[in-house]
């Protein structure tokens, strides 16, 4: 069996953003951070979950990942790296496509 080589497609520390919903109907913004990446697979941990209210004009402007929010007992998610025409992406635990975070504060109109 071939051993997968480490890759820099998504370097360790890369942040992904995803949006989800709780059963109560509240929206939540999730930040995931890459902990390992090979040629075909990426492992990432959730490092922030922030409930947001869409009845407000916009989300909090300081909604960015918090690097020191880390649960040592958390198990990383594993996802296959998907290749679209000109870029790579991964799927979130809920099955939505995630792209790397662009470094801008997340707003109500953030493009996922």
What would you call each of these model-derived segments?
Residues 1-31, 41-112:
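Mixed-charge, low-complexity intrinsically disordered regions
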């Amino acid at each position: 069996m071939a051993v997968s080589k480490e890759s820099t497609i998504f370097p360790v520390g890369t942040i992904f953003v995803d949006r989800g919903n709780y059963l109560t109907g509240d929206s939540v913004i999730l930040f995931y951070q890459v902990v390992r990446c090979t040629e075909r697979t990426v492992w990432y941990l959730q490092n922030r979950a922030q409930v947001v209210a869409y009845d407000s004009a916009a989300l909090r402007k300081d909604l960015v990942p918090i690097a020191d929010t880390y649960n040592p007992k958390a198990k990383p998610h594993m996802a296959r790296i998907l290749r679209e025409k000109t870029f790579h992406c991964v799927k979130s635990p809920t099955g939505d496509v995630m792209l790397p975070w662009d470094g801008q504060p997340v707003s109500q109109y953030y493009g996922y």
